């Protein structure tokens, strides 16, 4: 769908160039490259992915620096983190989700969550969490084995959810 849209935009730009060229017959020939068009939704998705990747790496750096094992990615945890970040961004408020639902859906024996808003990067949000006793305890908890991070932006403000877990045996 995105490829078709880009192709459509590119073809539209070419058609506009042809119409302009035909209407200016006799005028000196000039060409201008069309600026690439990137849909806002694509830019936001890429921005969220970069934010999430940055926060994931920063979290594991903090863990390793303190003798903890790095956490692996949790697909189910990522789904719930993204869902929570999206809800917070839509409401433009910060709140925790029901971790019992997350634990059940992801088959976890242990779960935790950090949430935040207003930090410009994944590194900065992890730095803030590390400065808070409760959030730092979640990040450094030895019971966790996997993590998911979701980030969404609303009106220029990032909303972030970090969900931790350990699979049930």
Please report, for each region that a protein language model flagged, where it lies by residue.
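Functional surface patches built around histidine and acidic residues
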Residues: 2-14, 18-169
């Amino acid at each position: 769908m995105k490829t078709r849209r880009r192709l459509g935009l590119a073809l539209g730009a070419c058609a506009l160039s042809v119409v302009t060229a035909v209407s200016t017959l006799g005028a000196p020939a000039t060409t201008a490259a069309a600026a690439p068009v990137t849909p806002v939704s694509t830019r936001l998705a890429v921005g969220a992915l970069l934010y999430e990747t940055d926060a994931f790496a920063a979290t594991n750096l903090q863990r390793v620096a303190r003798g903890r094992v790095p956490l692996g990615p949790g697909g189910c945890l990522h789904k719930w983190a993204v869902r929570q970040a999206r809800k917070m961004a839509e409401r433009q408020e910060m709140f925790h989700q029901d971790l019992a639902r997350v634990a059940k859906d992801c088959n976890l024996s242990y779960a935790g969550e950090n949430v935040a808003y207003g930090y410009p990067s994944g590194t900065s949000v992890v730095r803030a969490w590390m400065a808070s006793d409760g959030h730092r305890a979640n990040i450094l908890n030895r019971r966790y084995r996997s993590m998911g991070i979701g980030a969404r932006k609303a009106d220029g403000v990032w909303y972030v959810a970090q969900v931790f877990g350990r699979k049930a045996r």
